Amino acid sequence: TPASGFFGMR
């Protein structure tokens, strides 16, 4: 999911 990539970036 796109959300996983967002939190993974942080």
UniProtKB/Swiss-Prot annotation:
Its main location: secreted. This is Tachykinin-related peptide 4. Expressed in the antennal lobe (at protein level). It comes from Pyrrhocoris apterus (Sap sucking bug). The modification Arginine amide is found at R10. GO terms for biological process: neuropeptide signaling pathway. It comes from the Eukaryota. One of its GO terms (cellular component) is extracellular region. Keywords: Amidation, Neuropeptide, Secreted. It is found in: Secreted.
